[in-house]
C-alpha cells in the first residue's frame, strides 16, 4: 500500500495554481491545493524569485514523486505567452533542482483523461475534478482546479509511463 504524490502546476506569473494529489492502490485523494500570487508592483525578476521560493517550499512540504504541467499554449497575446513562459521556466528549473521528474500534457490530453472528451469546457472539467476526488465542492480558485486536473491526468497516465520506462 504505497502512496504516490503528484504535484500539478498551472503556471502563471501573477497567479500560479498548484495541487497535490495522492494515489494509493488506485484511489485518488486531494492532499491540498492553492494559488501562489505575486504583486504587479514587483519587478518581473522579483515575481519569478518569489514563485521559485514558494514552489521550493511546497516541494519541501508535500514531497511529490512527480510533477505534471500543461504544455504552453500560445494564444494571440504574445506578452502573456512570454510571461507565462518565464514562470514555466522557473517551475521546470525548481523541479529539476529537486530531482522531481516532470511530465507535460497538452490541454486536450487533460480533458480526455478527466472528462473523456477533448472538447470539455472549464465548468465540466472542474466538475470532473470534484467527482474524481469525491469532493464536496469544486476546488477554488480556478487556477488551483486546473492544477489539480493536470495532476489527476498524470496519475492516470503514470502506470503506462512506468511500463514504458521499465521496457527501455
Curated annotation (Swiss-Prot):
CDD domains given in the database record: RuvC
Alphabetical list of NCBIfam families matching this protein: PRK00039.2-1, ruvC
Record EC number: 3.1.21.10
Cofactor(s) it depends on: Mg(2+)
Native organism taxonomy: Bacteria, Bacillati, Chloroflexota, Chloroflexia, Chloroflexales
InterPro entries in UniProt: RNaseH-like_sf, RNaseH_sf, X-over_junc_endoDNase_Mg_BS, X-over_junc_endoDNase_RuvC
Binding, Mg(2+) 1: 10, 143
Transmembrane domains' residue ranges: none
UniProt keyword annotation of Transmembrane present: no
Binding partners and assembly: Homodimer which binds Holliday junction (HJ) DNA. The HJ becomes 2-fold symmetrical on binding to RuvC with unstacked arms; it has a different conformation from HJ DNA in complex with RuvA. In the full resolvosome a probable DNA-RuvA(4)-RuvB(12)-RuvC(2) complex forms which resolves the HJ.
Gene3D superfamilies per record: Ribonuclease H-like superfamily/Ribonuclease H (3.30.420.10)
Active site per database record: 10, 70, 143
An example molecular function term from Gene Ontology annotations: DNA binding
Subcellular location as annotated: Cytoplasm
Keyword DNA-binding on entry: yes
Function: The RuvA-RuvB-RuvC complex processes Holliday junction (HJ) DNA during genetic recombination and DNA repair. Endonuclease that resolves HJ intermediates. Cleaves cruciform DNA by making single-stranded nicks across the HJ at symmetrical positions within the homologous arms, yielding a 5'-phosphate and a 3'-hydroxyl group; requires a central core of homology in the junction. The consensus cleavage sequence is 5'-(A/T)TT(C/G)-3'. Cleavage occurs on the 3'-side of the TT dinucleotide at the point of strand exchange.
Organism of origin: Roseiflexus sp. (strain RS-1)
Superkingdom of the source species: Bacteria
Protein name: Crossover junction endodeoxyribonuclease RuvC
HAMAP family in the record: RuvC
GO cellular component, one term: Holliday junction resolvase complex
Pfam families: RuvC
Residue numbers binding Mg(2+) 2: 70
GO biological process: DNA recombination; DNA repair
Catalytic activity: Endonucleolytic cleavage at a junction such as a reciprocal single-stranded crossover between two homologous DNA duplexes (Holliday junction)
Cofactor binding comment, as recorded: Binds 2 Mg(2+) ion per subunit.
Family: Belongs to the RuvC family.
